[in-house]
């Protein structure tokens, strides 16, 4: 049994940075793009709740008034914009969110001599022997995350690599957040609220009902997320 998501425009991308935030990449016409946002909210009313958002304007050419209208439209939808990137600073006003670069405000600081130290090797995988309970968040952008228990409803697991859940997956699982398109998500019982790989996602309503409660895996084929039963 297989379920394939429709090819999605890169409306929402989740990237690994100094924070975990949704990155919105608007496309023209903006009205159609906003309708996609509305459709996502209609399917999952709490999808963006409490999540900081960054607007990447590198794919569109908006005037200052156009940017202001976009920000107002998102605010009307209770979406909190943390910052803006991909645009010239001159197009922003002091009342708009700050211009960001790589997850931080664009502030030029004088460089100071630094002592060169030998970098310690970082682990490339994380093993959790306990369940991830409702309300908990696990973030490991360096590589794979393996959970021997279950992931509760309302919990969130974010990984730079693949995610392995040896129990029920009821919360959110976001793999490949650093652009690792070959990352996968595996679980013994799929009841997820959200699955995402390199920013392409499916919500609970998008997942084939025939797969729910069964072992499954998810991966990307081009820009399409595929979910199949895990034999």
From Swiss-Prot:
Cell division recorded as keyword: yes
Biological process terms in GO annotation: cell morphogenesis; division septum assembly; regulation of cell division; regulation of cell septum assembly
Entries under Pfam families matching the protein: MinC_C, MinC_N
Record keyword Transport present: no
Keywords from the named record: Cell cycle, Cell division, Septation
InterPro entries the record matches: CAP/MinC_C (IPR016098), MinC (IPR013033), MinC_C_sf (IPR036145), MinC_N (IPR007874), Septum_form_inhib_MinC_C (IPR005526)
Listed NCBIfam families: minC
UniProt xrefs under HAMAP family: MinC
Function as written in the Swiss-Prot or TrEMBL entry: Cell division inhibitor that blocks the formation of polar Z ring septums. Rapidly oscillates between the poles of the cell to destabilize FtsZ filaments that have formed before they mature into polar Z rings. Prevents FtsZ polymerization.
Protein family: Belongs to the MinC family.
Assembly notes: Interacts with MinD and FtsZ.
Protein name listed in UniProt: Probable septum site-determining protein MinC
Species: Bradyrhizobium diazoefficiens (strain JCM 10833 / BCRC 13528 / IAM 13628 / NBRC 14792 / USDA 110)
């Amino acid at each position: 049994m297989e379920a394939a998501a429709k090819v999605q425009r890169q409306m929402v991308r989740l990237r690994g940075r100094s924070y975990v935030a949704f990155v919105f990449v608007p496309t023209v016409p903006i009205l159609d793009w906003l309708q996609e946002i509305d459709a996502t909210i209609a399917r999952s009313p709490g999808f963006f709740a409490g999540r900081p958002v960054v607007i990447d304007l590198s794919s569109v050419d908006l005037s200052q008034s156009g940017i202001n209208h976009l920000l107002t439209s998102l605010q009307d939808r209770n979406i909190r914009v943390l910052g803006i990137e991909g645009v010239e600073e001159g197009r922003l006003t002091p009342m708009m969110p700050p211009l960001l670069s790589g997850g931080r405000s664009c502030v030029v600081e004088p460089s100071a001599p630094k002592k060169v130290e030998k970098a310690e090797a970082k682990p490339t995988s994380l093993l959790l022997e306990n369940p991830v309970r409702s309300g908990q968040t696990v973030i490991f952008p360096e590589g794979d995350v393996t959970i021997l228990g279950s992931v509760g409803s309302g919990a969130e697991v974010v990984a730079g690599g693949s995610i392995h859940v040896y129990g029920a997956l009821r919360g959110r699982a976001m793999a490949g957040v650093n652009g690792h398109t070959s990352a996968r998500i595996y679980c013994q019982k799929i009841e997820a609220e959200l699955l995402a790989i390199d920013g392409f996602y499916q919500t609970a309503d998008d997942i084939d009902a025939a797969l729910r409660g069964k072992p499954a895996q998810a991966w990307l084929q081009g820009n399409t997320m595929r979910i199949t039963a895990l034999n």
